[in-house]
């Protein structure tokens, strides 16, 4: 899990994620009413209007999904697209929305574990580490 706000995000890992040849999955999480002008990526920031932030999150999501037009001549301007990214948009970060996110990730862990034939409720790896530690 990592993240950043503003131009630091744009010019570091967002560019790497968009143009990387590596495959990844990711989640974009947007809280539109917890805006702080100190960390805003827009020059004409309006604290009372969260439309710009929502539109920016949607545009990043679509860029990951669709990529750029394949007719672009320069290779370094091409963005591949077809990257599996989910977009979660919330009005505010509070106890309820944080609980929703935790529930989503717990369900995702359980679902993926069932496909890998793993019981996510046992701790054999943890117990093995404890046994090895006792023998050192």
Where are these regions (language model features)?
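A SIS-like phosphosugar-recognition module
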Residues: 1-136
